[in-house]
A protein has these predicted regions:
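N-terminal helix-turn-helix DNA-binding core of bacterial DNA-binding proteins
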Residues: 4-45, 70-80
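Amphipathic alpha-helical dimerization/coiled-coil segments
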Residues: 1-5, 26-27, 77, 81-115
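Beta-hairpin "wing" of winged helix-turn-helix
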Residues: 58-67, 74
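Hydrophobic alpha-helical segments
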Residues: 32, 37, 59, 71, ...
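Short, hydrophobic-biased segments on the C-terminal half of alpha helices
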Residues: 53-54
Length: 115
């Protein structure tokens, strides 16, 4: 991940509805959530949610799958791990013991997404 890619990702999360959407999808895990359900839970019109889904998708934070007439969105956990790793690269001036809990969490996310 380079700086421009990180900025695109962070800008996508820098809006309240998109951040809430992303967090709900993280909580939902691999099952994901239907677009209509997310719009309803967040109290956002479906056409507005469509724009938010597009921004999150372009940032590679979520993916979608059409299931009949419904669209299910899922979080891209490997992208979450990638951006988190980018943000903490070189953490704590090389004193890795200070960052160990965070590094272990990232490793757990990466392991879960590669399985």
């Amino acid at each position: 991940m380079d700086d421009d890619d990180a900025v695109l990702t962070l800008v996508a999360l820098g809006q309240n509805t998109r951040l809430q959407t992303f967090r709900l999808l993280v909580q939902a895990g691999p099952e994901g959530l239907q677009a209509g359900h997310l719009a309803e839970v967040l109290g956002v019109p479906r056409n507005t949610m469509s724009s938010h889904f597009g921004i999150l998708s372009r940032a590679k934070l979520i993916s979608s799958e059409r299931m009949g007439r419904k669209i299910v969105y899922r979080v891209n956990l490997s992208r979450l791990a990638e951006v988190t790793s980018f943000l903490v690269a070189g953490c704590c001036g090389g004193q890795s013991s200070l960052c160990e809990p965070l590094i272990e969490m990232i490793a757990g996310i990466e392991k879960a997404t590669s399985a």
